[in-house]
Amino acid sequence: MMKPLFPLIISLLTFGGGLYAQNFQLNKSGYFQDKGVDVMAFDDIYPEGHQGGVSLIMHGHRIATNGDIRLEETPGQWQPVPKQRERIADPQTGTIKTYLSYPDSSRHMTGFNPMIYPDLHFNYEVITKAEGNAIRVTVNLDRPIPSEYIGKVGFNLELFPGILFGKPWLMDQQGGIFPRQANGPTLESRSNATRSWDYIHSDKSIDKQANKDILGRQGDYNPIVADDIVSAPYSTGHTFTVCPDDPLLRFTVHSEGSELKLYDGRMNHNNGWFVLRAEIPAGATKEAINWLITPNVVQVWIYQPVVQTSQVGYHPNQPKKAIIEIDKRDNRIQKAQLYRLTSNGKELAMEKQPESWGQFLRYHYLSLDFSNIKESGLYQIQYGESLSSVFRIDKTVYDRGVWQPVLEYFLPVQMCHMRVNEKYRVWHDFCHMDDARMAQSMNHIDGYAQGASTLTRFKPGDVVPGLNIGGWHDAGDFDLRIESQSGEAYILSLAQEAFGVDYDATSIDQQKRITEIHQPDGKSDILQQVENGALTVIAGYNALGRLYRGIICKDLRQYVMLGDAGAMTDNQLGNEDDRWVFTEDNPSRELETASHLAAVSRVLKGFNDTLSIQALKISRELYEITKVDNRSKNAKIHAATELYLTTKETKYKDYLLAEKDYIASHIDQIGWYIGRADKAMNDRSFSETLRKALADYKGRIEEQGGETPYGIPYRPHIWGAGWNIQEFGFKQYFLHDSYPDLFKTDYIYNALNFVLGCHPGSNTASFASGVGAVSATVGYGLNRADWSYIPGGVISGTALIRPDFPELLTFPFLWQQTEYVLGGGSSHYMFLVLAAQKLLNEHD
């Protein structure tokens, strides 16, 4: 929803954007700008995530992106993207030239998510140039497109559906409305997949090469194919206008050559966008595409200030600081008001001029400190016409409905090999009871790869019994990665040790495979979840004789499945729909898992002694048998630390003491966990060496934390940074707990506030779904097709549209902004809340 604008601006909008002369300039940041409208060209590098090519930001909202040559009418995540070779921005001529080519051999049948390129080879340049109040986009090819690909190759511009549903469009003289769902009819054509490139990576091992028969499987629907069936265009013409009724979103594209066609990408990808497309004509090279994009620039528009606070609130003893994000052209710094909400309405609790912090990304920032306000109650901050969400100040602010949804909802919903009920509701039925078969040797999807050897007694395709127990689905994809399974159990174990979590709202029966949300069973929920993680790791080790790399579905049709996890397979072991189990030789991951299991063993003692003993046994074995190299030494130290804390055995202590110089030189990675061993070992020389290194590390953190108005190290790249910031705060707790004279609590609180809403951009939602006054209630989880959420899941958060636009869209299909994950996504958040609760109550 568009944010309300200042009254003056609203009164002027009816006159359109022609009050003053408009003129796009190529600014110092490398994109075209005129007041509140920006046109980027190939700044972003993530086209499969709808971040790339030519992009258009209209008055604070990214409405179009991925303007580039594509080989399908409506490509998705799995379709070929070009290789970007060079980008040259020339402020003197107001031009950005980008040089690209097809195919990209580094992605063909290899890589994290392999693609299949057709046998089509050409180079091209995309030229974007400011022309007064418009941007001209031209495309030049180095050769004509072969006849068999005419109609397949075209220039696409993707339009963000979330802001356009129900909005009008015009194509020449025809008008229409962007529909909520994709509507037929469909068109059929010969797919590029039938002309696939036969290039073989002769220099790559078998685990770096995809299996075309599996990846490109023919027959029923396969997401790797996006051009055999597409939506019929909603309209065709030469001049297309988006939102002719809205001066804030209106822009026009005129094609001086090929006809424009408006497609709906959701016809063959549920997560697709609307696509405006012009095909490359036969024989064309020079100006094969020639578009003039004319955005409506509202000259009087200015970004409305955004008041950023925690959506939950603050403990009275907690430092309290609101961040106010304003347009860098806005020179009017006003006083801010803090109101207390009473039964009689608002009462002014404080009025104060915020301090100017300076510029970060594209905005100017102000800081409003109200730490002196300690009276319990409901509050709201006003700055000009802008209001924060309502928040609490109270000693009990973290006592209910803040960390608890992680245990009450998110972790139970994510449990694999279970049926999960919530009273009337079934979150998912019995699932993946047919886990698993041994993977084939190949480069699979989502980063999975199996080498020439299975590293076990099992051959490719063999049934591996005993894997259908425990674990949690990776929230978007349903797979089980070793680091997410053991890592989740580890973080929960550390939370139990640090805070003694006593909470029971869920019944979990591992024998009957039934989980009942809000049906207490007299057992600790957090320990039952630690047990759930331990079960899959230990079962995998016992079945395979080693750790699994992960368990994932065998093909893309299963991988993109939306909905009930129980629908992915038939739960009958030994047939073609079974998931695959992968193995690897990865010393770092094996030793990290050893560290996790050592901690798990501690907390399960007395709760599930058998599992506790097995966890420690496997941890010891991994520590002894895993070869250590330069890349895995940190993990060896981590394993030794946790094993020493669990066993107090001298050999682990001696190893740590012998490595004190290495530990000191890598203190930024090791410092957070070594402190507990430092205390327990009580070795003066070791402690002194570490403290010198820690003091230097503290200085580096303070320097980075000072780079942003949020008081934490934060250097956005592409993905939302919420998970990394949570992890930073989690580690800061251990540094503070071990070395309180060096590391204060501010970073813990600042990291928590960031996740709960005090973060860049106009969307100040809490990243924790269902937590706070406004939260991310559209998430990339199992129910994303319904534009819904899982309470207690924590999304990735505000992303960066390069080079400087912070964005958090209300849209369920952008994994880099709204995905939930295991192995820290929610558990680091829960830990942070528990840490704040403990620290603040201690000083009450």
Regions inferred by a protein language model and the residue ranges of each:
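Acidic (Asp/Glu-rich), glycine- and aromatic
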Residues: 136-186, 385-397
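Short Pro-Gly-centered flexible turn/kink motifs
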Residues: 139, 280-295
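Carboxylate/His-rich catalytic cores and anion/metal-binding grooves
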Residues: 485, 523-548
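Aromatic (Trp/Tyr) and acidic
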Residues: 206-248, 256-259, 267, 312, ...
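Beta-strand-rich N-terminal accessory domains
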Residues: 22-91, 184-230
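Extended, loop-rich substrate-binding clefts of extracytoplasmic carbohydrate-active enzymes
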Residues: 73-144
